[in-house]
């Protein structure tokens, strides 16, 4: 790849976008997804250290191996996803500028880069505990095979399947310290699993025409907005009891989680009254991003004291 290339088919505000090889690589591995998953990985690891009474600095080697290893398997999985989806990504506005579509990164480069990153990441996780590496592999397999290759283009439950892989990072972080999955770790998994479904359904509403153009059977494409809204409400409601299983982390965590859940549910119910469904979907999507960030960062901050 050249150090700097011009993207000829995309312009933003009339300007041709210029990218570098490094930016193309970050786009290939979906750096935003990598960063957001690192938050949840770190939270799972931090809470395992906290509950076990272990020192953070005394386990810095484990912390670094876990964070770097997790980053690599997530990045590698995203690269393989970009490789596999390159035949449909050009049909969607939000994905047609990916380097695997524009030709900035060749298919074989994307595939083998992804495989190499996954292999290196699993090796690093194996240097913490076997369980962390096993869970990491399960996450990779679920995202690459069960989601990307199997369900994404065939079934509306693709969102549910994909949410499994997105919920494993805190389990990786936890087991890298403990070697087994504790109750708190399972609760974190469930929060993330359930959270992703309304999060991505809100995005699917916003990008319905994109998904329709690519023939991807997202729920709003197949069953319409009203069914999707009801599904979003059901999944958000499923989050309500989960903070009460985190009592060992302190009452503030329980209260904050409950407030975030109730706020999201109220906003969700407003969707039945709002006439502009795209505005509502945007509000739901933004709320979901803040929900995840605030809650998982708060779990770390509140357990510092």
UniProtKB/Swiss-Prot annotation:
Keyword entries, A-Z: Cell membrane, Heme biosynthesis, Membrane, Transferase, Transmembrane, Transmembrane helix
Annotated GO CC locations: plasma membrane
Keyword presence, Repressor: no
GO terms assigned for molecular function: protoheme IX farnesyltransferase activity
S-adenosyl-L-methionine among keywords: no
Transmembrane segments: 38-58, 60-80, 115-135, 157-177, 181-201, 236-256, 285-305
E.C. number: 2.5.1.141
Membrane topology: Multi-pass membrane protein
Subcellular localization, as worded in the UniProt entry: Cell membrane
Catalysed reaction equations from the record: heme b + (2E,6E)-farnesyl diphosphate + H2O = Fe(II)-heme o + diphosphate
Pfam families named in the record: UbiA
GO terms of biological process kind: heme O biosynthetic process
Highest taxon, organism lineage: Bacteria
Class of the enzyme per the UniProt entry, highest EC level: transferase
Pathway: Porphyrin-containing compound metabolism; heme O biosynthesis; heme O from protoheme: step 1/1
PANTHER family: PROTOHEME IX FARNESYLTRANSFERASE, MITOCHONDRIAL
Listed HAMAP family: CyoE_CtaB
Note: Carbon 2 of the heme B porphyrin ring is defined according to the Fischer nomenclature.
Similarity comment: Belongs to the UbiA prenyltransferase family. Protoheme IX farnesyltransferase subfamily.
Role noted for this protein: Converts heme B (protoheme IX) to heme O by substitution of the vinyl group on carbon 2 of heme B porphyrin ring with a hydroxyethyl farnesyl side group.
NCBIfam families recorded: cyoE_ctaB (TIGR01473)
Self-association and partners: Interacts with CtaA.
Protein name: Protoheme IX farnesyltransferase 2
Organism for this UniProt entry: Bacillus velezensis (strain DSM 23117 / BGSC 10A6 / LMG 26770 / FZB42) (Bacillus amyloliquefaciens subsp. plantarum)
Phylogenetic placement of the source organism: Bacteria, Bacillati, Bacillota, Bacilli, Bacillales
